[in-house]
Amino acid sequence: IAPTQEGGIYYTGPSDDFSRPGRMWWSVPEGVTEFDTWRELTTVYHEGVPGHHLQIGQATANRGQLNSWRRVLAGSSGHAEGWALYAERLMQQLGYLDDPADRLGMLDGQRMRAARVVLDIGVHLGKPRLNGEEGIWDADYALEFMMRNVNMAEAFVRFEVNRYLGWPGQAP
């Protein structure tokens, strides 16, 4: 895996003619040589099958039924992320997260998503900081908040916070 400054897992869809397949990308911050897999299985289901890969692949396969505006411009994070979260839960219900470590990974992911919804609202609506702290949400406070509320290495948290700062509403 090629090192990056920040790390993250994400999905890119196939080309319209499927000559380029959909792919799940997994980047790792430079210097990170080991990472726990217990938290990643649920992410594989979220980004891969039956998550975004199935969701985006179906939209591509059925592109003839959708005009360009609906396929490209009218995407909804609520729909896409809602589907991916459903995919995680479905795999758990089907018994694919029965290992206690994998189940803990799913719960850890839910904790992270709850924290990022709070961050998204705080930053993009200019809300006051929590617990009576002076000031409003900004990038520095968002990073501090996430470091206090998620179980991730700082490089991964920085990647996530930068993504949320530039993509309002992506955090359901």
Feature-to-residue mapping (PLM):
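Long, His/Glu/Asp-enriched segments that create or flank divalent metal/ion-associated functional microenvironments
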Residues: 1-172
